[in-house]
Amino acid sequence: VITLSEATSQAQVRDEFEFADLDLAISNPMSDSYAEYRCDYELWEVESGLFLYIGVNALWSEFFKDGRNDELRKALTYAIDRQAIIDAYYRGRAYPSTLPTSPGSPYYSESLASRYEYDPLRFVSAIQNMYVPKNDKGEAKKLLLLVNCDDSARLRTARYLAKQLTELGLETGTLEYGGSTGTTYEQVLRAGSYDIYLGQTKLSATYDLSQFFKGYGNLGWGGIADNTLLNMCKEALANSGNYYNLNKMVADDGKIVPVLFGYYEVYAERGQLLDLTPSRDNVFFY
């Protein structure tokens, strides 16, 4: 018999696990309300599908519209120190990924992923001849990175990315919008008044990316619909042997740039559940 307990916060779950009769708990380390566990426990990491990425505004951005700065777009992956982001802003509890597939997935290729890892010199080389739009005074414009400021980890990550890009020669600022700013993050996304954005979504267990690339897809911000990539998504869903090609095409294209994948943490009282093998959709799986 499994008895479920209700809780109103991550801290309450943690406290009841540590000091009361709760034997099993699940936590999301990417959550702002994450609470650290400090007792004796057994721990499982379960891939969650939570996906943090950079999206490019290919339709309206002065940096990228009309096919501008393809080399810059494709080189953004080399400017991202993913492990530094995870260590600084996600408590070291996430998986760095250069591909739109979690490293814990059977569809992930380490050899392919290594081609798109942090390489600042390669990024600097790629942007030497980039187009930089000017304002009415003839001054170079900053690249603007949109972020949802209601998520503190994502906000800190965006500020770090802007600083890193600036240090590498691409002057970048942040656009910080959320529920407390009057104008919401989604309103700015819909308006298209940004150059790149730091997004987060939850992908299915099959890593279906079709909502990024289908016409009017729920994740196709910035006009990134692409029939070639959409068809490759369908081919991967039909035959898992095609995920390598899909991941390569998405990484080479650069309209979405993976940063990291999250995972759930499943805690159990030591010795209580020796044969537990939790999955993302069933924490009680034996």
Where are the model-predicted features located?
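Extracellular/periplasmic solute-recognition and catalytic clefts
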Residues: 3-60
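Append "and occasionally in soluble cytosolic enzymes with long acidic Gly/Pro-rich linkers
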Residues: 67-167
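Extracytoplasmic/peripheral linker and loop segments enriched in polar/acidic and small residues
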Residues: 74, 86, 173-183, 210-272
